[in-house]
């Protein structure tokens, strides 16, 4: 196969794709290379093993991350009027954010909200000094990212003010990743090549886009590319639980189709 290649294939392996754990180092390393096109795979629990989704257009979501701390004034729980309880605005934000996104953003922006961390206090009778809230919002419209971030901050500041609190943000509160939008030409070339090598039945045309996020969008700033979703679900084996669930597992037979897709990309480029 190597004799059939015209050019050079670079293989990239990175850590922490949603958290941007390794992408800055990777992009710096790629500066000295000329890259024409890029390709990536992500295992996907909703697809049966032996299937791959390789289609044009939006495939994985962009992400806004927020890490905010509400500041009040600590005191005894018996006299909340003499304290300023930061838990109150933080708790209001749990419902407020979802309502704000639904009512103030274009419905076609399809933003979703995930509230994943709420920390405040350490005992039953003391009002704490601070309350911490973090999570993310996902979107497929590139223009939605800054709008979502602005709306989150305005909602937090207004809610904090109503309850006599202030709010601060960690530097991580920002648009962390843009949507992965497959280039039509690259996606079609890989899809056609897979049909030729493995048969058209391996291609899943009905797989919806995925709301998780990927640093592959950063690679696509450098050159056109496409990302495939590789099926790993096998009920007989017991695989197919949601990603980041304690029961998550994969059918390793899926890796064969994954390797074939990478080979097709290299040969058809």
Protein language model features and the residues they cover:
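Metal-dependent amide/peptide-bond hydrolase catalytic core
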Residues: 88-269
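Histidine/acidic-residue-rich, glycine-tolerant segments that coordinate divalent metal ions
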Residues: 2-128, 214
């Amino acid at each position: 196969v190597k004799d059939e290649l015209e050019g050079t294939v670079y293989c990239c392996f990175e850590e922490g794709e949603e958290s941007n754990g390794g992408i800055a180092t990777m992009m710096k390393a790629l500066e000295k290379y000329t890259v024409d096109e890029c390709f990536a795979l992500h295992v996907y629990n909703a697809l049966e093993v032996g299937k791959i989704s390789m289609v044009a257009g939006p495939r994985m979501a962009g992400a806004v991350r927020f890490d905010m701390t509400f500041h009040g004034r600590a005191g005894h729980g018996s006299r909340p009027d003499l304290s300023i309880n930061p838990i109150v605005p933080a708790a209001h934000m749990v419902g407020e954010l979802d309502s704000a996104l639904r009512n103030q953003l274009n419905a076609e922006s399809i933003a979703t909200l995930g509230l994943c961390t709420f920390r405040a206090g350490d005992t039953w009778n003391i009002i704490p000094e601070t309350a911490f809230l973090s999570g993310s919002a996902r979107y497929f419209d590139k223009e939605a990212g800054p709008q979502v971030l602005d709306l989150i901050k305005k909602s937090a500041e207004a809610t904090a003010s109503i309850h006599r609190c202030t709010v601060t943000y960690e530097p991580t509160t920002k648009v962390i990743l843009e949507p992965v939008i497959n280039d039509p030409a690259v996606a079609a070339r890989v899809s056609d090549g897979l049909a030729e090598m493995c048969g058209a039945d391996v291609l899943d045309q009905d797989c919806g886009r995925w709301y998780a996020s990927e640093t592959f969008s950063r690679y696509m700033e450098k050159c056109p590319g496409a990302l495939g979703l590789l099926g790993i679900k096998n009920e007989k084996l017991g695989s197919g639980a949601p990603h980041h669930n304690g029961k998550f597992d994969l059918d390793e037979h899926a890796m064969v189709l994954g390797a074939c897709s990478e080979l097709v990309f290299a040969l058809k480029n």
